[in-house]
Amino acid sequence: MFRKRQTIIISKAGNTLEEMCHDILKQAGGEGLLKIAFFRNAANDSEYLQVLGTLRSTVESFFVTERPLVSYIAQKPGGSTLAAEALYLDDTVANIERHSRYTLLTRGECKEIITEGIVPTDISISAFEQSTEIFSTIGDILQKNGFQPSDIYRQ
């Protein structure tokens, strides 16, 4: 296992989604930041995808290098319009291998994969089809990095 910590961050400034996201990213900083999971209400699937796209593009433009993974949970945060849970790596001897939608941490024989929120390519398909696609994506990531599906310990 690797030493990690989580922090909850609440947007305190901004009127637009981009401004609130920037405020959270400034508060989060960049040192050791592996993943940021945003919380914001969404009225429907279309709004969910729009918000996710905005959050991803804002994070990509904010972090030129070592971009953290991005997840979005469609849930109204208490006391704010946008909140986030930031995951930091405090383990200075870990090797970090960043990929487009996941990060691989290694140190000797120890390996850990951290993923973004994995979203199906089409959220209008049935829940069965969505879950099949998502688990296939997860399986591909695990296989590519020498893991077994039974190695998953937190979803």
Functional labels for PLM-detected ranges:
Residues 1-155:
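Short, polar/acidic, helix-capping and beta-turn segments at strand->helix junctions
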